[in-house]
């Protein structure tokens, strides 16, 4: 072969190789960038959601949570349905995000330098700052911390693989003496509960998580902010450029339309923040508010065979007998009905006192009838009230758990021991309906019975008969 032919062959060979490599790279990029098209074609957006109040949980009338609602909005924008995989801890959520079939991971995740090295974050949708919360008894013994220096000697526990553990490690490098423990066993909410019961002294949580939980734990106190405000974002599947670009565009629309502001107000702006045990105010409202609605309560009580004092007490627990009451979750009226529940009950105007009272009575009647037949007497009403608060599914889960623990699943005395366990990962991860604020349901029923007792003692009702 002549030299010229050899040279030409070599050039052709390398040119062909370069073109093949370039075409392969372009094709590879097209495949990687087609995640958005694949989602639309399959009709499903596969997401990981942290099972927590700030993110996703099953409420009394279905799925709830700020990030769940936001993802549902994005799925609607794409014209697909959400396919949800739940995680019980942030560490578990991060592990699940590595599954190539998962498109988005949502777990109130703070964008940190360390995380951005490993994960592909989408656009930011929320800001929060980390806060140290401690048991209030530390105020009494002079050990309550005011800054990172004063954490020395305290029992501080935070979640493993969280931004909180990164914050502590960063502070240690700066010379702060913080003897913190990192755990993958407990969720953030479980650690808050441990602070409340003083199993540990302090933990670190995001400001939005503190806002959601401070109402339920009377012994936790905000100590100080331990970080500046930082951005939170979803983790996207790798090389999802088209998905990320579409998300930026959608998020801009959500912000401009006011939908984001409405969602934040829905979950984090507390229009009602009641002191449920303010008996002095309760006595006052028996005289000033109850008479306006007394006839409606009595008529509904007769129609649905529900004790009048229990129905009136339920309404006070829900709204303080304020017909215009609106809660952070969007429920409203004297009986605090959701829009979906109101529609199901035939209630057209939730702030109309008569409609709300009869709708709430009908809803409670449905709960009573849905409680297992083996639950009898006074307990039947208590089970129904718990279901009114947290949902029938979670009450059924608690009964199943009670049975597993060798307790009487049809006894309120035993069920109230089990309901708080629905917020503990080792229990709720095995149950059909997942995480629930079972402790809140117990307090809810107890409060209603406190009010009911006061009403009865004031001769509002001479005797109580149960269905």
UniProtKB/Swiss-Prot annotation:
GO terms for molecular function: peptidoglycan lytic transglycosylase activity. GO terms for cellular component: cell outer membrane. Residues 16-271 are annotated as: Non-LT domain. Disulfide bonds: none annotated. One of its GO terms (biological process) is peptidoglycan catabolic process. Residues 1-15 form the signal peptide. Murein-degrading enzyme that degrades murein glycan strands and insoluble, high-molecular weight murein sacculi, with the concomitant formation of a 1,6-anhydromuramoyl product. Lytic transglycosylases (LTs) play an integral role in the metabolism of the peptidoglycan (PG) sacculus. Their lytic action creates space within the PG sacculus to allow for its expansion as well as for the insertion of various structures such as secretion systems and flagella. The N-terminal domain does not have lytic activity and probably modulates enzymatic activity. The C-terminal domain is the catalytic active domain. This is Membrane-bound lytic murein transglycosylase F.
């Amino acid at each position: 072969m002549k030299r010229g032919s050899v040279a030409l062959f070599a050039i052709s060979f390398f040119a062909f190789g370069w073109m093949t490599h370039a075409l392969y790279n372009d094709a590879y990029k097209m495949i990687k960038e087609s995640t958005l098209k694949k989602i639309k074609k399959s009709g499903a957006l596969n997401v990981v959601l942290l099972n927590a109040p700030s993110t996703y949980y099953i409420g009394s009338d279905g799925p709830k949570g700020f990030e769940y609602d936001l993802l549902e909005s994005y799925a609607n924008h794409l014209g697909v349905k959400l396919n949800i995989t739940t995680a019980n801890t942030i560490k578990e959520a991060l592990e699940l995000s590595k599954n190539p079939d998962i498109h988005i991971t949502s777990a109130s995740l703070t964008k940190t330098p360390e995380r951005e090295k490993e994960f592909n974050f989408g656009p930011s949708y929320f800001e929060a700052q980390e806060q140290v919360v401690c048991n209030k008894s530390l105020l009494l013994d002079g050990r309550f911390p005011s800054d990172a220096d004063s954490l020395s000697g305290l029992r501080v526990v935070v979640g493993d693989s969280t931004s909180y553990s990164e914050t502590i490690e960063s502070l240690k490098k700066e010379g702060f003496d913080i003897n913190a423990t990192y755990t993958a066993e407990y969720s953030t909410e479980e650690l808050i509960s441990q602070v409340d019961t003083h199993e540990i002294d302090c933990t670190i949580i995001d400001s939005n998580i503190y806002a959601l939980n401070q109402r339920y734990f009377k012994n936790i106190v905000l100590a100080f902010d331990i970080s500046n405000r930082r951005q939170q974002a979803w983790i996207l599947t790798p090389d999802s450029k088209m998905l990320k670009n579409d998300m930026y565009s959608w998020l801009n629309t959500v912000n401009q339309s006011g939908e984001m502001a409405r969602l934040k107000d829905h979950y984090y702006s507390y229009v009602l923040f009641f002191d449920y045990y303010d008996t002095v105010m309760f006595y006052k409202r028996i005289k000033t508010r109850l008479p306006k609605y007394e006839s409606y309560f009595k008529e509904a009580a007769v129609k649905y065979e529900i004790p009048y004092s229990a129905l009136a007490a339920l309404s006070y627990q829900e709204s303080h007998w304020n017909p215009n009451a609106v809660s952070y979750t969007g429920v409203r009226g004297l009986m605090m009905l959701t829009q979906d529940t109101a529609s199901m009950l035939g209630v057209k105007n939730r702030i109309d006192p008569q409609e709300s009272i009869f709708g709430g009575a009908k809803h409670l009647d449905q709960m009573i009838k849905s409680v297992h037949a083996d639950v009898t007497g006074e307990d039947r009403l208590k089970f129904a009230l718990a279901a009114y608060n947290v949902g029938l599914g979670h009450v059924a889960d608690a009964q199943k758990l009670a049975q597993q623990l060798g307790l009487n699943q049809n006894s309120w005395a035993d069920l109230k021991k089990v309901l708080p366990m629905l917020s503990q990962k080792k229990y709720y991860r095995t149950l059909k309906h997942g995480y629930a604020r079972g402790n809140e349901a117990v307090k809810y029923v107890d409060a209603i019975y406190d009010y009911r007792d006061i009403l009865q003692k004031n001769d509002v009702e001479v005797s109580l008969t149960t269905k």
